[in-house]
From Swiss-Prot:
Annotated ATP binding sites: 12-19
Pathway where this protein functions: Pyrimidine metabolism; CTP biosynthesis via salvage pathway; CTP from cytidine: step 1/3; Pyrimidine metabolism; UMP biosynthesis via salvage pathway; UMP from uridine: step 1/1
Reaction equations catalysed: uridine + ATP = UMP + ADP + H(+); cytidine + ATP = CMP + ADP + H(+)
InterPro entries on file: P-loop_NTPase (IPR027417), PRK/URK (IPR006083), Uridine_kinase (IPR026008), Uridine_kinase-like (IPR000764)
Gene Ontology biological-process annotations: CTP salvage; UMP salvage
Keyword Nucleotide-binding: yes
Record's keyword annotation contains ATP-binding: yes
Biological source species: Listeria monocytogenes serovar 1/2a (strain ATCC BAA-679 / EGD-e)
Protein name in the entry: Uridine kinase
Gene Ontology MF, one: ATP binding
GO CC field: cytoplasm
């Protein structure tokens, strides 16, 4: 195979609309082979600590992720090598013993809140996208999602947001905006910005031979 894969990084705060942007890219390039890698399956394996201790971990901090493994996997995919991607158990806050074999694709989309925090990972990306959404909107989306999909109470979501999510966003996520090639305000609803982004991806795909 002569073409090199193109790696697109999509980041932004929790509830910013990263998933909507990622879906828009996938829909646009449905004729190409696409692989989506979520950063949050690369949380550290915590099988060696108790469930109670796992609950105390700050999952919005860069140290919560096994970034070295993620970097090695993205580098392997760029060389057209398969990887053994972790499978994360969100109910138990640790990895499953099983892994998922992933083959390289033409377009690799890496999505996550802290994918631009490490320069080694940034250097593996062809396009870096930051989805920039108002803090209040992001909070409301997270509140509704966690109450509906994860059975959380309103008080617990608010407490976590104020004590962990918001401070970590301001300290680690928001500052990575300066590394983005493209900033998309208001996420998946910004069709003009998404069209510009997909045009850029098409241009790079044509050159990657």
């Amino acid at each position: 195979m002569t073409k090199k894969p193109i790696v697109v990084g999509v980041t932004g705060g929790s509830g910013s609309g990263k998933t909507s942007v990622t879906k828009a890219i996938c829909n646009h390039f449905s004729g190409h082979s696409i692989l989506m890698i979520a950063q949050d399956v690369y949380y550290h394996d915590q099988a060696n600590i108790s469930f109670e201790d796992r609950l105390k971990v700050n999952y919005d901090h860069p140290l919560a992720f096994d970034t070295d493994l993620l970097i090695s996997h993205i580098a392997a995919l760029r060389r057209y090598e398969s990887i053994e991607k972790p499978i994360y158990d969100y109910a138990k806050y640790t990895r499953k013993k099983e892994v998922e074999i992933q083959e390289p694709r033409e377009v690799i989309i890496l999505e996550g809140i802290l994918i631009l925090e490490d320069k080694r990972l940034r250097d593996l990306m062809d396009i870096k996208v930051y989805v920039d959404t108002d803090d209040d909107i992001r909070f409301i989306r997270r509140l509704l999602r966690d109450m509906k999909e994860r059975g959380r109470t309103m008080d617990s979501v608010i407490e976590q947001y104020l004590s962990v999510v918001k401070p970590m966003h301001n300290e680690f996520i928001e500052p990575t905006k300066k590394f983005a090639d493209i900033i998309i305000p208001e996420g998946g609803e910004n069709h003009v910005a998404i069209d510009l982004m997909t045009t850029k991806i098409e241009s790079i795909l044509q050159k990657h031979v």
